[in-house]
Amino acid sequence: MTFKPFLTDQEIASLQIQEAQSDKKQKRTPEQIEAIYTSGTNILVSASAGSGKTFVMIERIMDKILRGVTIDQLFISTFTVKAAGELKERLEKKITEQLRLTNDTALKQFLSEQLLGLQTADIGTMDAFTQKLVTQYGYTLGISPNFRILQDKSEQDLLKNDVFDDLFTDYRTGDQAELFTKLVRNFAGNRKDSSNFRQIIYKIYDFSQATDNPQRWLLENFLKGANTYKDFSAIPEQEVKDFLNTLQETALALRDVTDLEDYKQVTAKGTPTAAYQRHLKMIEQLQDWVLHFDSLYGRDGLGKLANDIATLIPSGNDVTVAGVKYPVFRSLHSRLRGLKHLETIFKYQDQSLPLLQVLQSFTLDFSKQYLQAKMQENAFEFSDIAHFAIQILEENDAIRQLYIDKYHEVMVDEYQDNNHTQERMLELLSNGRNRFMVGDIKQSIYRFRQADPQIFNQKFKDFQEHPEHGKLILLKENFRSQSEVLDATNSVFTHLMDEAVGEILYDDTHQLVAGSSAQKIPYPQNETQVLIYDTKDQQNQDLAVEDDSNQISLGEVKLVAKEIIRLHNEEKVQFEDITLLVSSRTRNDGILQTFDDYGIPLVTDGGEQNYLKSVEVMVMLDTLRSIDNPLNDYALVALLRSPMFAFDEDDLARLALQNLPDQHKQNLYEKMENARNGQGQQVQLITEALSAKLDAFFETFLSWREFSLLNSLYDLIWKIYNDKFYYDYVGSLPKSEQRQANLYALALRADNFEKTGFKGLSRFIRMIDKILENQNDLADVEVALPKNAVTLMTIHKSKGLEFKYVFILNIDKKFSIQDMTSPLILSRQNGVGIKYIADMKEELEEKLLPTVKVSMDTLPYQLNKRELRLATLSEQMRLLYVAMTRSEKKLYLVGKGSQEKLGDQYDGKSENNHLPVADREHYLTFQDWLLAIEAAYAADELHFKTSFITDEDLTEDKMGSLEAEQAYDADNLKDNRQSDDITRALDMLEAVEKLNQHYKAAIHLPTVRTPSQIKKFYEPVMETEGVEVMQTSYQTKPKFELPQFSKKAKQDPTALGSSVHELMQRLHLSEQVSLEDILTALAELSVEENVKKAIQVDKILHFFQTSQLGKLIQANADKVYREAPFAMLQADPASGEDYVVRGIIDGYILFDNRIVLFDYKTDKFTNSQAIKERYRGQMTLYAQALSQSYNIQQVDSYLILLGGEKLEVVEI
C-alpha cells in the first residue's frame, strides 16, 4: 500500500491555521502541531508543566505509524517502567481505534501488525533496553546471557565491602603503605578507623558510574583540577570577575546604607561622624581597588588584595542603623574566606597531589575488582549493564549499524533527567539527525541520581543559536492549573531563576500560559497563600520549635488541619482532592498524629523508611540475633522481655546474679544456663515459677537453634511465628494489618536474600546491621488504604501528577548542604577537590608540639564547592517549581518563623528584575526566597498573599471540627423516610441483578486472553481414565520415605517444554542442520544440566533430516520467523464484546501466497490424534492471526510432536 508522505513546513503552517480556525472545543496549539508533524531533523521539545507532552508524543508516534513507519522502527525511552506501560496502553487504544475507523483492508493489515508488534517494541526504560542488548550481544564481551541484576542495596554493599576490605589490606601493606596511611588519615576526621575513607571511595565510584566511560573519567578527569589550579594564574577568569563584582556591590550597598534617612552622617556640630568617615573610606577604597585592580594587584596579587580587604572592613556582616541590621558585608566575607589564605594554601597544596594519585589508583583498582566480583556472581548493577551496552556499540560497528538502520527515530521522554551514560547511548543509536527529545529543564530534580540538566540546557542553547543543528519547540501553554496558580508560579520564578542561580533565565520563553479560556476565569478566593506559623510564643514550651528548623512544628500542622476542616465543611472539598507535599519521607509522625487527632483521614505515598524500626520487626530481628549468637546480651534481653517469653525486670534481675563463683564476667545466657542447672551463685533466688519459665524458654530456643542449622531462613522465621503464635499475637494489636504485613515481608525478604546466593543466618543479620549502621532502612510494606483521604507524599513522588488542592509543607526547612561540608567534592569537569590536612609546624615555628595539623580548602575544592552550591540551589528552585505546578485550583505554602524577626531579615533589594545574586546564594529555604521576593516587589505583581498564624488562631474552639454525617435513628421513623430509602435501595439492587444476569457473559469476559486459556475453554475430555467422579480427600495418609539420594529428581515438563522452544529459537538454520548446530544451541541454554540432558537431541535431528516439514524449513531459512508474538481482536459469541488475544507463535514460513505454521509440543502421548484435537483450537487462532496480519488466506498448520516414543509431524 502507499502511505502519505511526511508534512512539509508549509503544510504544517497551513495545518496550524486550519486548527486555529476550527470550532474544536479543545484546539491543539501551533507548537503542539509543530512538535507532532515536524520530521527530518533533531527536535528538542521544551515542555513546561501541564503542557501536554505525553499527548504530543502519542500523536507523533501515531502519525509516524499512519505514514508507514512500523512500531519496531521507533526507539522510545521513558524515565520509569510505569510511564512505559502507560504509553503502550494509550498506543494500543489509539491503534485499536484506528482499526475500527478504517475500511482500507491493507491499512487494517498494517495496523494489526503494529498492534502485534507493540508488546515487543523498544518502548521502555533505558535500563530495560540495555539489558536486552547485553543479553543478545554480551557474548562479544564474554558476558553470559543469563546474568541477573543486583537490585538489592544490601547485596551490593556486602560485595562492595568484601572487595574494599581485601584491597585496603593490600594497599596498607604494599609499596606505598606510608603514603596510603597518610591518605586514609586525611579523611579519617575524628574516627580512628577506615569508615570515612570507605565512604569516600564509594562516593567516587558512584559518581564515576554516571559518566559514559568511568575508567576514562578516572584516568583523564579525576586529577584535572589538582593538576591545573596550582597558583593564582590558574584561577578562572569568571571567578576573578565575580570577586570584583562583589567588591563593587558591597561598596554600593554600603553607600545605600549611608544614604538612609536614619543614618547619622554628621554630628550636632555639622562635622562628619566617625562611622560615616570610616564607611566613606571603605567605599572609596573598594571602588578604587576594583577600578585599578590590574595595575595595583593583578591576578597574582589576589591573595594580598583579599587580606587588604579583610583588614579594611569589619569582621561582622552587618551595619546597624536605627536598630535594623543590614548585611552589607555578608557576600564579601563569604568570598574572602578562601581567597585570603590562598598564598599559604598554595605552599602546601602540591603535597596533596601524591595522595590524590594514590586515591586515583585505589579507586581504579576498586572499580576493576568490584566488577570482577560481580562477574564471578554473574550479577551486575544497572550502571554496569549500561556501560557494557555502550562498549558493545562502540567496539562493534556492525552491531551499531544494525540499530542505526533499524530506528527511524530515537525518542526520549523526561530528557532533562538523563545522565551522561544515557546520553551516550542515545548518540550511538541515532544516525545524527533523527532524535526527538521531550523534557523541561525546570523539572530536573534527580541530581542525586546523577542526572545532569546541563545536557538539556546545552542542547537548548545549541538549537536556539544554531537552527541547522536541530529544531527547538517550546510548549508553554499549561492545561492543568487555574490562572491563580500559574500567576503565582510565574511571579516567583521571574524574580528568582536566572542563569547565575538557577541555570536558566525564567523569561517569556519559560513562563506558564493558560491553555484554555476556562483556566483564565478568575477565582479570587483561590489566590495562592503563604501561611507562616508565628513562633514568637513558642520559645519556652515543650512543643517549641527546635533549633533544627528541618522539623515541622505542631503549629504548622494544626494550621493546615484547620484549613482542611474549613475546605471540607464550607467548600465541600473531598479529602481525596487534597495533597500535602513534603521534602522528605522522614520525620512526618507529627502530621500523622495531628490529623488522626482531628479525624482527618490521611494516607502516605507508601515510601516511608521505617520498616526496621517497627516494634514487631525489631523483636524478630533480636530473636534472630539471639539464635545466631546467644551471648549477645542486648538481643537476648529483648527476646526475653518480648511477649513470646514475657520475662519481667524481677526475673532478669534474679538471673543476672547467677554467675559461677569463680567467673564474674559471664554473659546472661551463661547465667541462665547456670540457673537452670542449679549452679548459680545465688541459686536461692530462682523461684519455681522462674525455673518453669527457664525450662520453657530453653526447650523452644534450643529447638530454634537446631532448626536454623539445617533449614532456610524463611522456614525458621515461620517456625518462630507458629511456635509462639507471634504472628497471631500482633494481629490482635492496633494497626494489625500493617504489623502482620511487616512480619510477612520479613520472611519474604529473608527468602529473597538467600535466593540471591547469600546463605546463612549470620550473613543476613550482618546485612541488616549494616543497613542500620548506615542509618538506612527498608521501605514500609504497603497495605490497603482508604480511598477518600488526604494524601501525604514527597515532592519527588508527585512529579508528573496533579491535585486540586496542594499544601507545600515545611517551606522553612533548610536545604541539605551536607555534601558541601564533605572533605572531598567532585566535579565532572574539574575532577576531585579535597580538604588537605597539612602539618604547619615549620610555618608556625612551633617547637613544643610534634605536629600542627591544619585543614585547608585547596583551590580545586573551593571551585568545586562553589559549583556544587550553585547546582544545589538551582535544583532546589526546580523542586519548588515542580511542587507549585502540581496544583490545579489552589496552592498553599506553609512554614514557620517569628514575624518580628522575619520582618527585619529582608532588605527589599533587587537587581535586573531578580533578587540580588548574593541573596539568592545566601538563602537556604523556600520561605526565605518567597519573603525576600515579597519584600522587594509590589504586592499587585506577585499573585500570592502572606499571612502569619498565631497560637490564638489555633485554639480548640477556633480549629473547628469535621461535620459528621447524621445516622438514621432506627426507633424514630417520623419524617425520616427511611422506609422509602430501603424500598428504593431494594429496587436498585433488583435492577442491578437483572443487568448482571443479562450481561453475565460480558461481565465474566476478560479483556485479554491467551490461546492456552481459550484452548482450555473448548478442550474436550480426551479419555475417561483419570477423570475423578468425586473429589478426593485432602487428608493424606501418614508415610515415611527414606531419602532418595540415588534417585533422579522428577523432570518438570514445563521447564522441558520451555527449553525445547528456546533451543529451536537459538538453533542456526541452514540448508543442512547438523548435530553440531543443535549441540551448540543446547550449550547456550541457561537451564540446569538435568533439563538439558532430558532434551532428546536425536529426535530434533531426525526431524530436520527426514521430515518434509524439516526439509522445507531448512530450504527456506530466510523466510522462517520464530517465537513471533501477536495480538488480535476477537469477538466473544456469548456477550458480543471484543477482547484481545495475545500469544507467541513458535514459528512459521512466509511465502508469497501461503503460510506454513508449525508448533513444537513435548507433551507425553500415545495417540497423536488426541494431541491433534487438543491443540486444534489453539492452532486455529494462530492461523487466523497470521492470515489477518499478512492478508493471506492459505495457512497450513503442523504440530511437531516430540513427546512420544518416536517423532511425529501431524497436519491440522
From Swiss-Prot:
- Decide whether keyword DNA damage is in the record: yes
> What InterPro entries does the record tag this protein with?
AddA (IPR014152), DNA_helicase_UvrD-like_C (IPR014017), DNA_helicase_UvrD/REP (IPR000212), P-loop_NTPase (IPR027417), PDDEXK-like_dom_sf (IPR011604), PDDEXK_AddAB-type (IPR038726), Restrct_endonuc-II-like (IPR011335), UvrD-like_ATP-bd (IPR014016)
Domain UvrD-like helicase C-terminal, residue spans: 510-800
Q: Which Gene3D superfamilies match?
A: 3.90.320.10, P-loop containing nucleotide triphosphate hydrolases, PCRA, domain 4
GO CC list: cytosol; DNA helicase complex
Listed SUPFAM superfamilies: P-loop containing nucleoside triphosphate hydrolases, Restriction endonuclease-like
What this protein catalyses is: Couples ATP hydrolysis with the unwinding of duplex DNA by translocating in the 3'-5' direction; ATP + H2O = ADP + phosphate + H(+)
Could you confirm whether the keyword Ribosomal protein appears in this record? no
PANTHER family, per the entry: ATP-DEPENDENT HELICASE_NUCLEASE SUBUNIT A (PTHR11070:SF48), UVRD / RECB / PCRA DNA HELICASE FAMILY MEMBER (PTHR11070)
**Summary of the function given for this chain in its UniProt record:** The heterodimer acts as both an ATP-dependent DNA helicase and an ATP-dependent, dual-direction single-stranded exonuclease. Recognizes the chi site generating a DNA molecule suitable for the initiation of homologous recombination. The AddA nuclease domain is required for chi fragment generation; this subunit has the helicase and 3' -> 5' nuclease activities.
Entry's family note: Belongs to the helicase family. AddA subfamily.
| Protein name, as recorded | ATP-dependent helicase/nuclease subunit A
Species for this entry: Streptococcus mutans serotype c (strain ATCC 700610 / UA159)
Q: What is the lineage of its organism?
A: Bacteria, Bacillati, Bacillota, Bacilli, Lactobacillales
What's the gene? Answer: addA
